[in-house]
């Protein structure tokens, strides 16, 4: 069975897809609203990149599981 947990840096706690997506939406909203310093913008952007990677890992894992299930179903049919 394939592990579907995202690969993250050791200091990053595991986070669900939904939590990562929700936090990413909040970050994008803050960045789009403006009025924050360059340093804070860069910090938010870096966090957003990490969250986007986590979301992509979850989606890749889900895609692999679906493809495996389809393959199993196709080989099981007479």
From Swiss-Prot:
Enzyme Commission number: 3.1.11.6
Against SUPFAM superfamilies, the record matches this protein to: XseB-like
Enzymatic reactions: Exonucleolytic cleavage in either 5'- to 3'- or 3'- to 5'-direction to yield nucleoside 5'-phosphates
Q: Which UniProt keywords apply?
A: Cytoplasm, Exonuclease, Hydrolase, Nuclease
Q: Which Gene3D superfamilies match?
A: Exonuclease VII, small subunit
Q: Is this entry keyworded Cytoplasm?
A: yes
Matching InterPro entries, A to Z?
Exonuc_VII_S, Exonuc_VII_ssu_sf
GO CC terms for this protein? cytosol; exodeoxyribonuclease VII complex
Q: Which domain of life is it from?
A: Bacteria
The cross-references to HAMAP family, in alphabetical order and at most eight, read:
Exonuc_7_S (MF_00337)
What is its biological role? Bidirectionally degrades single-stranded DNA into large acid-insoluble oligonucleotides, which are then degraded further into small acid-soluble oligonucleotides.
Kindly give the PANTHER family that the UniProt entry links to this protein. EXODEOXYRIBONUCLEASE 7 SMALL SUBUNIT
Protein name in UniProt = Exodeoxyribonuclease 7 small subunit
Species of the source: Cutibacterium acnes (strain DSM 16379 / KPA171202) (Propionibacterium acnes)
